[in-house]
Curated annotation (Swiss-Prot):
The keyword Lipid metabolism does not apply. Residues 593-606 have a biased composition (Polar residues). Residues 406-556 form the SF3 helicase domain. It comes from Human papillomavirus type RTRX7. This is Replication protein E1. The gene is E1. GO terms for biological process: DNA replication. Pfam families: PPV_E1_C, PPV_E1_DBD, PPV_E1_N. It is found in: Host nucleus. There is a cross-link at residue 513 (Glycyl lysine isopeptide (Lys-Gly) (interchain with G-Cter in SUMO)). The modification Phosphoserine is found at residues 81, 89. It catalyses: Couples ATP hydrolysis with the unwinding of duplex DNA by translocating in the 3'-5' direction; ATP + H2O = ADP + phosphate + H(+). GO terms for molecular function: ATP binding; ATP hydrolysis activity; DNA binding; DNA helicase activity. GO terms for cellular component: host cell nucleus. Residues 581-606 are annotated as: Disordered.
Amino acid sequence: MADPKGSTSKEGLGDWCILEADCSDLENDFEQLFEQDADSDVSDLLDNGELEQGNSLELFHQQECKQSEEQLQILKRKYLSPKAVAQLSPRLELMSLSPQQKSKRRLFAEQDSGLELSLNNEAEDNAPEVEVPALDSGPVDEGGTGDVDIDYLALLRSSNRKATLMAKFKDAFGVGFNELTRQFKSYKTCCNHRVLAVYAVHDDLFESSKQLLQQHCDYIWVRGIAAMTLYLLCFKAGKNRGTVHKLLTSMLNVQEQQILSEPPKLRNTAAALFWYKGGMGSGAFTYGKYPDWIAQQTVLGHQNAEASTFDFSVMVQWAFDNNHVDEADIAYQYARLAPEDSNAVAWLAHNSQAKFVRDCAAMVRFYKNLQMREMSMSEWIYTRINEVEGEGHWSSIVKFLGYQGVNFIMFLAALKNFLHAVPKQNCILIHGPPNSGKSSFAMSLIKVLKGRVLSFVNSRSQFWLQPLGECKIALIDDVTDPCWLYMDTYLRNGLDGHFVSLDCKYKAPVQTKFLPLLLTSNINVHEETNYRYLHSRIKGFEFPNPFPMKSDNTPQFELTDQSWKSFFERLWTQLELSDQEEEEEGEHGETQRAFQCSARSANEHI
């Protein structure tokens, strides 16, 4: 019979297995087995003495602290992990509404490898923190309404409060908050107009604010949509951001972090239309009339039609009527007129403002110069003293002349010939020692008559006498020997009252007569033989006494415009000045019409 498959009989090879399988006759119990193992040839291998506790408690304490720290890190990573978004998507980690500052302390301890890295609490975390708000609908507190508390909690959980408020504002009103406002970085900058977006205001406080704000504002625009409330407030007085926030937080019972506050855009037509159209709807509450910056950009009228074109002649007429001759004065005063004058608004909007100012000043000077030349000295004095406001007394001038020992009758006669420019009598010299009031007396007369002062320091220029053709009276103060020599050499003909050739800048020399010239000097020219040819051409008066002062260091004699006004009015007849009431009437008894230099007709409707 064949052998079973898979088995092979090999005799003679299995004896060793039988021998190894024989059981040993040695049967020992466990105690004998341990006793035999304990026997050793090495002495003192085992220490059978009593054991001490050692540092096992400290080791156990360290193990417990390590385990607690690991559990705490697990809880932090579970509930407040700033890297949860980073683990989901690297792109989502980089998305942020505002830049995040680096944390100063570590929220999560690093894996300690024996270098005690976990103890370094002030190391900076280079990874940006992205906080994930959990907007779950939890139970609301019992102290307030559910909707307000949910909105407020959503605001608190957001990482960027301002961006969240702006997003909710745009969702509610359909326009961005920055599109209606301009940015004020400082909290101390005052402004009369404010745009405020307040989040989560109670309905009762919202309604009451419409009445409470009326005592603080001239204009109120209020509208509430969902949890967002929008205010446009035009305060009666300028307020800074901190003051406005303090007012709203106390009135609406909200926190400052629920408020966005910026001034409105005043020159943006789209923003003005937003307030204008929003105020016409039923959902908005308004109080007061529209502010000027809204009305000018939305309300159509004849002012808007005229403001688009600038009339240069109107500007010249305004400067002429108000006696504005200086370029800086014209520019500043006409700019201040813009809120009231449409032509000034058009001038401000023009690109050639400086050119118009220069041309306006030049035209006014042309008109004023010719007007002055056509006036007699009587008309000029009458015009100038009528511009002086207030009342004075002419006796102050008479008393001062008496104090200086001047014969008033002789002075009055010399002044009469001086004002009428009588040949060889149209120059008066006031001489005397220093600090005797010579310059104060002469300057007060020049000031009230709008004269010009000549300075000999400019005598090296051939145009230093040009102001003589632009005034009715002139003064050379503190004449010294070089000036006397110049006058003796070149100005004899002018002092005689004859025509002279006067060189003017940017124009050909003009033919003119010397106007009344007043001089002050420490030198009595009548005692100088070197200038004997000037003796008959100059009338001199001496002021020998020092100018008197009161105990409070004010002049004892008031030489003011009001004093000279009273002086001329009192001595008008003695000075042989003409009656101005008769000169103001024409040949047929008609009053003279005021000068008009504008292009608008006199009969045109205003």
